[in-house]
C-alpha cells in the first residue's frame, strides 16, 4: 500500500464482531418510504462512481477527505439517533475504546442486479478508522469480496472489513441488500506521523 500507512489496529482481512440486536432498527429501515430514499440519496456527500446505483441515507460524515477527526451530524441523524446508537455500541463492544467516535454512519441500499465496482477506499480519512458493516436485509444472491475472498454476510452479524484492499459487492438476488455501514476510531490513539504534514501541505496549496 503506497502513501499514508493504515492504522495497525485495522483488520487486514475481516473481523467477525458477533451478532447484534437490530430488531427495532430493521423494522424502521424496512418502513422507510421510497420518496425518502430518493431525497436522501440525491443529497448524499458520498457520490462516487464505483458505487454505481447503490443508494444511501447518510447520518454522519467526515468534514473533509483528509482527516477523520472532524465529522458532523447530517439532518437524518437526529430522528434516527435513538435507533442507531444501541446498534453501533453493540457492534463495537469488543474494541474497548473509552471514547470511540463514529465519523461516518450510513445505510446503503443495493437493488437486485446492483454492483459496487472493485475499488479501495482511497481518501486518507478512510485509512485510520475501522470500517464496519451490519447487514439489515440481504438474500443468498448477495456476494461481497473482502479480504481476498468472496463472502456472504448474514443479517445482524457485525463485521469489520478491510476497506484498503480491493473489494466489491454484487446482488444477484431478487431483493434489496441494505447494510448499516460505519467507521469507528479511538480518539485516544495518537494520530499517525503522516497526518500533520498532509494537512499542512493541503493548506499550502
Question: Can you annotate each of these PLM segments?
Answer:
Residues 112-113, 156, 164:
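Tight coil/turn sites that cap or link beta-strands
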Residues 1-8, 197-205:
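Fe(II)/2-oxoglutarate
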Residues 116-121, 143-148, 192-193:
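A short secondary-structure junction signal
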Residues 118-119, 142-144, 161-162, 166-174:
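Short beta-strand His + acidic residue motifs that chelate non-heme Fe in jelly-roll/DSBH
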Residues 135-154:
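A short beta-strand-loop-beta hairpin characteristic of the jelly-roll/cupin
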Residues 129-135, 158-160, 175-192:
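A short hydrophobic beta-strand segment most commonly corresponding to one strand
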Residues 107-125:
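Conserved short histidine dyad/triad with adjacent acidic residue
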Residues 1-97:
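Non-heme Fe(II)/2-oxoglutarate
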